[in-house]
UniProtKB/Swiss-Prot annotation:
Native source species: Vibrio atlanticus (strain LGP32)
Protein's recorded name: Large ribosomal subunit protein uL13
InterPro entries: Ribosomal_uL13, Ribosomal_uL13_bac-type, Ribosomal_uL13_CS, Ribosomal_uL13_sf
PANTHER family linked: LARGE RIBOSOMAL SUBUNIT PROTEIN UL13M (PTHR11545:SF2), RIBOSOMAL PROTEIN L13 (PTHR11545)
BP-aspect Gene Ontology terms: negative regulation of translation; translation
Amino acid sequence: MKTFVAKPETVKRDWYVVDAEGKTLGRLASEIASRLRGKHKAEYTPHVDTGDYIIVVNAEKVAVTGNKAKGKVYYRHSEFPGGLKTITFEKLIAKKPEMVLELAVKGMLPRGPLGRAMYRKLKVYAGTEHNHVAQQPQVLDI
């Protein structure tokens, strides 16, 4: 018997909606990253994108434990000398609530073209409304 290898054209992708209200950031992000990769499926193949589409609502209400609301710092650099920019979790969740979850999930996905394709299947919204009703997403309880 030969080892099964999934082909990109035969992969069936489902749409799921996840409510992030009150969920811990890291635990939620790791489960979402695993589902974007397709690791929950029997036909998972590492070099093929077998994951599902994930819609996350209420990203502004995601929780962090301990003092991370004030202490967790996000860094970025402009590539110019002295161009290091920092922002705390508290300020980032007030300014761009979607970005917190997007950065957490993106860091858990592979680097390269396959990881970027997986990341594009993640849709994050700050509030309860999303514009993917036509895809008939199923509710996923994480």
